[in-house]
A protein has these predicted regions:
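An acidic-aromatic substrate-binding cleft motif
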Residues: 1-24
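Aromatic- and carboxylate-enriched substrate-binding clefts and catalytic-loop regions
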Residues: 32-222
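Glycine-rich, aromatic-lined ligand/substrate-binding cores of catalytic
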Residues: 212-246
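Conserved aromatic-histidine-acidic binding/catalytic patches
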Residues: 5-9, 118, 225, 229
Length: 246
């Protein structure tokens, strides 16, 4: 995610994905790693939510996407640094809407301060503050590393979907999710509401990146033989079964 020779969220790459989306009638594209702060990953996670990296021209990306009829989906990864996010949240959401971006994915891939858990009163109050702030800015939310769904989308319909599951990403750095995992989700996790599992990986053996010198080991669970335990047909089926209005 950080800006180096492996940086993915660049203006050039963004246009490639926008072109692909337009050609395949995909309505929106999400870009992660576009903003300054990823170089602090593993530390205090001091992200700046209104300062793009030098190789990501957000004005040009949004202009190009609009020209192609594609929505840009925003991204706020907090790393669990709640005080840092809350200081910037209102301004950052307004900044997005000023750029014509009205859908936002949030992330909390890290520990909350002072040992607070995601489901603590501190965490629940924060998540509610995000939903209400987004509503004021007429933004739709997709929360990753969220608290469990309790039906608040009936009151706050901008809370469109959330992760809250061992999702697709686990296949990239571990033994992966077993085939039985997807069979259980509709009868367990999905009882509470929409599930943003992020299905749709067609390179199930990671052949495009497996031997790339640019590939980087993520953690100790990555043994170098990660793959998606699925078939192409199942990936298509997951889009239908694992409901997420995003």
């Amino acid at each position: 995610w950080k800006m180096d020779e492996r940086h993915g969220a660049t203006t050039v790459n963004a246009k490639k994905y926008i072109d692909f989306a337009a050609a395949n009638q995909i309505e929106g594209v999400l870009f992660e790693g576009w903003n300054e702060g990823w170089e602090s990953w593993g530390g205090m996670q001091n992200f700046d939510f209104t300062k793009p990296y030098a190789d990501f021209d957000i004005d040009e990306v949004v202009r190009y996407a609009k020209e192609k009829g594609v929505e840009v989906i925003g991204h706020h990864e907090t790393g669990g640094n709640i005080p840092n996010y809350e200081r910037q949240m209102d301004h950052a959401m307004q900044w997005y809407t000023d750029h014509g971006i009205h859908v936002l994915k949030t992330g909390y891939a890290g520990a909350f301060p002072n040992g607070y858990l995601h489901h603590s009163q501190y965490g629940v109050n924060h998540y509610q503050k995000v939903v209400e702030t987004a509503a004021r800015h007429k933004m739709t939310l997709d929360a990753h590393e969220p608290i469990k769904d309790t039906g608040i989308r009936r009151t706050w319909p901008n809370m469109m979907t959330r992760e809250g599951v061992r999702g697709m990403e686990w296949n990239a750095w571990s033994e992966g999710n077993p085939p039985s995992h997807h069979v259980m989700l509709p009868f367990t996790r999905m009882l509470s509401g929409p599930l943003d599992y992020t299905p749709g990986t067609f390179d199930i053996l990671f052949l495009n990146t497996k031997d790339s010198p640019r590939r980087q080991k993520w953690n100790d669970q990555d043994k170098g033989n990660s793959r998606v335990n699925t078939t192409l047909a199942k990936q298509l089926a997951n889009w239908v079964i694992l409901y997420s209005p995003l």
